[in-house]
Amino acid sequence: MSQHKFLFTSESVSEGHPDKMCDQISDAVLDAHLAQDPHAKVACETVTKTGMIMLCGEITSKAVVDYQVLVRNVIKKIGYDDSSKGFDYKTCNVLVALEQQSPEIAAGVHVDKDSDDVGAGDQGIMFGYATDETEEAMPLTLLLSHKLNRKLHELRRSGELEWVRPDSKTQVTIEYASEGGACVPLRVHTVVISTQHSPDISLDDLRKELIEKVIKAVIPANLIDDKTIYHLNPCGSFIIGGPMGDAGLTGRKIIVDTYGGWGAHGGGAFSGKDPTKVDRSAAYAARWVAKSLVKSGLCRRCLVQVSYAIGVAKPLSVMVFSFGTSALNEGELLKIVNDNFDLRPGMIIKDLDLKKPIYEPTAENGHFGHNEFPWEQPRHLQIDVELLKKIGGKTISNGNGIAH
């Protein structure tokens, strides 16, 4: 099999990054409404700068939510509890500019419609991606970037790295081999970590601790060699962080939220949107489809696209692409998708149980690759006899299964 090598890079940002703060606040608002009113229609954007949070958007809900308390609790959880860290939940100003959902949108999307036939909340294109390079069916570049951030802030919370502050970014470059369209990680080429820190640690000590306590704890030793490059706080000191260093806005980390630059992206953000917004629910469903195909052994990589028109329930188009890693052609894979998945928004919401208040955790370390989310549970696929014959009648060894 022909093979060539290439480098690919993905990044992640921490829960204390200003944009991620806004994502978490927007999703906390969504969860607060869904907890009281599962039919709430929410489109909540958050913006932050020094000492200020602003909520803006459209919400139609029976819920009663104390936004002042909610916002401050999210900021406190993240760890911004003193102005020296760039933000303080106790003293920040919380502004609220929320209005009702447009009655024209409501009439076209959900009013007087059966729950199964709810129309798409907007037009748009959404993508799902999966790859067999990791158990999570996620790109290793992004998975490691997320894990580096998560480990860094576990150590911050435990007090083991008490000099770490909430704002950080990570980036991982991996050398891959391409094998017939599949991607095989060979080694970690470069690791970048930039973390906010207290003034009382030297850069030398900071870099040593990042290598010993974060990088070595996260990245498998067999992927690191003497040629691996480290850029640890390469700009020098990073004391001024959070919203004091940069403004934040919901929906500005859509590649971090999804596949780290792999696959494709339709442009729509997730956070702060209830599941009638197909930007969110259809992207989750597309991931569910792609992961189900990969975990069933039908292909090693998979990209799924769906598209919608506002107020129309049925997708305008569905596309499946296997990068040449399947014994089946794209038309045959599409038949399997159509036979096993109903991609109308109402059915996505029902099948994935998306009216529950589950969204704030999605805004922390990526929306995909975490098994606690329902769209990460592969569907047991029903495949007709003729297609089973073409793939040799095999059932997949990982236990997710093909039925006939």
From Swiss-Prot:
Q: Which Pfam families is this protein grouped with? A: S-AdoMet_synt_C, S-AdoMet_synt_M, S-AdoMet_synt_N
- The residues the record assigns to binding L-methionine are 58, 101, 246, 277
Question: Catalyses which reaction?
Answer: L-methionine + ATP + H2O = S-adenosyl-L-methionine + phosphate + diphosphate
Q: Which domain of life is it from?
A: Eukaryota
Enumerate the residues binding ATP.
17, 167-169, 235-238, 246, 252-253, 269, 273, 277
Q: Which UniProt keywords apply?
A: ATP-binding, Magnesium, Metal-binding, Nucleotide-binding, One-carbon metabolism, Potassium, Transferase
Task: State how the cofactor is bound.
Answer: Binds 2 magnesium ions per subunit. The magnesium ions interact primarily with the substrate. Binds 1 potassium ion per subunit. The potassium ion interacts primarily with the substrate.
Q: In which pathway does it act?
A: Amino-acid biosynthesis; S-adenosyl-L-methionine biosynthesis; S-adenosyl-L-methionine from L-methionine: step 1/1
- GO CC terms: cytosol
Question: What PROSITE patterns does the entry give?
Answer: ADOMET_SYNTHASE_1, ADOMET_SYNTHASE_2
Cofactor names from the entry are: Mg(2+); K(+)
Which terms in the Gene Ontology molecular function aspect does this entry carry? Answer: ATP binding; metal ion binding; methionine adenosyltransferase activity
The record's EC number reads 2.5.1.6
UniProt KW Nucleotide-binding keyword: yes
Which amino acid positions bind Mg(2+), per UniProt?
11
Q: Which CDD domains match?
A: S-AdoMet_synt
What GO biological process term is on the record, naming one?
A: S-adenosylmethionine biosynthetic process
**Enzyme kind, highest EC tier:** transferase
Residues annotated as binding K(+): 45
Similarity field: Belongs to the AdoMet synthase family.
User: What functional role does this protein have?
Assistant: Catalyzes the formation of S-adenosylmethionine from methionine and ATP. The reaction comprises two steps that are both catalyzed by the same enzyme: formation of S-adenosylmethionine (AdoMet) and triphosphate, and subsequent hydrolysis of the triphosphate.
Q: What else is known?
A: Protein expression is regulated by post-transcriptional regulation: under rich-diet conditions, mett-10 binds and methylates sams-3 mRNA, directly inhibiting splicing and protein production of S-adenosylmethionine synthase.
Q: What is this protein called?
A: Probable S-adenosylmethionine synthase 3
Source organism of this protein record:
Caenorhabditis elegans
Lineage of the organism: Eukaryota, Metazoa, Ecdysozoa, Nematoda, Chromadorea
Q: State the gene name recorded for this protein.
A: sams-3
